Amino acid sequence: MSNEKLAQKLRELRKVNNYTQDYVAEVLGVVRQTYSHYETGKRTPDTEALYKLAGLYNISIDDLMHLTIDIDRNVSYDA
């Protein structure tokens, strides 16, 4: 996942949950400016921060990183 897509997802998750950047930064144990850089794509959260973010939003790391692949079960394949 690109920094830009992760940044957008972090922004969306925070806003949907009505959290402030200050609050999320506090949960992560970083200053607000660092968290702001995550949302703008200037920095990438480390592994520990990603786990904390997934826990905060009650989603898996795969969902956070958009690694989950939707499978279309209606597609048939000829052998």
Locate each region found by the language model.
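Alpha-helical residues within the helix-turn-helix
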Residues: 15, 26, 55
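Residues that mark the N-terminal boundary/hinge immediately upstream of a DNA-recognition element
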Residues: 9, 20, 46-49, 60
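Residue-level detection of the helix-turn-helix DNA-binding "recognition helix"
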Residues: 15, 29, 40-42, 69
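DNA major-groove recognition helix of helix-turn-helix/homeodomain DNA-binding modules
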Residues: 29, 48-63
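Short alpha-helical DNA-recognition segment
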Residues: 18-37
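A short, Lys/Arg-rich alpha-helix, primarily the initiator
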Residues: 1-16
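Short, charged recognition helix plus adjacent turn
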Residues: 65-79
